[in-house]
Amino acid sequence: MTSARGSRLLHEVAVRIIVRYLQSAGYPDAAASTDAINGAQCVDLAYSRDGARRRVTVKADSYAGVDPQKIARREMAFYRPSTGMYGLESLADTFSRQPGWVQRSQADELFYYRLAIAQTEDEVAALMDEPDDVFFAEIAVERDDLRVIPMRPLQQWFAAAGERYAPRPVLTEGRSAWYRIVPEADLEAGVAGVQRVGSIFAHVRA
């Protein structure tokens, strides 16, 4: 079983789904980026579009659920209540003061992917070890929504407007990070070119 847990596991699930979606949508060379250099630059995957290689930061967000009974089940760690917010990391590590991924990313685009998974963390981790036909048949993504955000305009907007939003501590992958929780209407009014792709899981499962 994969050793990833928590936000790292959710991130790996999101990257796997998005790569499959891009490949099915006419970008056959879409692939996850796993080397250390891309990791340091917050680049999670890449694909070719209009003759150019596009690099992507993926942000997975489990706050997409709407079923109260599933939200109440604490063992369903990846089924949190939908909020209509963006979570943007302003500080990656309280101790080292490393800037968050918004500032550090060298990607061209942010793929902000909300997904609610109606399974336990252990069930999700076990499925990550399975081949694609099993993974995509059995992973219980109940709701999902993809937004594609141009990274440079986002970084410029966040540098100017980020302080308007109260910071919130988040424990992620053993680090104490800080996030700004931004209403989606604010971000999408301030950053030109946001694409509301919508649900993609149905396309990769078909």
Please place each PLM-identified region on the residue numbering.
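Nucleic-acid endonuclease domains
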Residues: 1-55, 59-206
